[in-house]
Each structure stands twice: as structure tokens, then as C-alpha cells.
Amino acid sequence: GLKPTHVFMAFGSNDLETYGSNSSEFIAAYKTQIQKIQAALPDVPIYINCILPITDDAIAATPDLAYYPEYNDGLQTMCQEMGCTFIDNSSIIESSSENLYEPDGEHVIQDYYPKWLTHMAQVAGLQA
């Protein structure tokens, strides 16, 4: 079977539409997945990616998206409780000279992904 040395997880904005203001239910579902991984891979570090900022236009179109900061707060607390590392990727969006959003203002374009991969590797100490 697979023997990963690091696990990276990213659930996010699509779940905001499912859970709405109920971030605690989202966190509970996330914890369940992490517990399964920790049971199977007890010595493997787990990294949890933030939910990226969402544009005002996207929030106006889908008000439940406005809860993303609350979800990120819950993810940070969950990481502290479970011994995981929270990765805040918002600086990738905020520091970019280009608009990295799809027209929906919620999802990102292809150019985001190499930047994201590099950032995750840096946080995990996987890149010189």
C-alpha cells in the first residue's frame, strides 16, 4: 500500500454551501477524516489548508460563503487540538499581481496551483 510521509488536506468553499453557518458540523466531519488518517498513519504529519478568501461578489451571490473566516478559525482550533498544521494560503491570493480567481470569485484559476504547491512544500519543510 501507500506509505506517505506527509498528508495534505483541503476541504473548503464548496462545503460552505452544504453546511452554511454550521461550521461546527463541518469541523466535526473534518475531525472524523483526520482521526481515520491518524489511526492508519500515526507518525505522519497532517497539514490542513485554509479555505481561501472569497470575493465580495461571490458572497453577494451566495451568502453562505461569508462564513469562510469562521470556518478557518474552527480549522485552526481543530489543528491545535489534533496536532495538525494549519496552512494559511491567503497570502498567495493577496500578494499576487494577477487575479487568481475564476469569474465566480470563489474558485481559483490554474495559475494558483503551482504557487499553492510551493507554499505547502515550504510549510512542510519539503523544499530547500
Identify the role of each PLM range:
Residues 25, 29, 67-70:
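Alpha-helical initiation/capping and key positions within long helical/coiled-coil segments
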Residues 40-42, 82:
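Helix C-cap/helix->beta junction micro-motif
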Residues 1-25, 52-55:
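Oxyanion-hole/transition-state-stabilizing segment in secreted/luminal serine hydrolases
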Residues 30-35, 72, 76:
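Generic structural signal for well-ordered alpha-helices
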Residues 52-128:
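Catalytic His-Asp segment of secreted/periplasmic serine-dependent ester chemistry enzymes
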Residues 1-3, 33-39:
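Short amphipathic alpha-helices and their capping/turn segments at secondary-structure boundaries
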Residues 29-30, 41, 50:
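Internal catalytic-core helix/loop-beta-alpha segment
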Residues 5-11, 45-50, 85-88:
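Structural recognition of the beta-strand scaffold that forms the well-ordered cores
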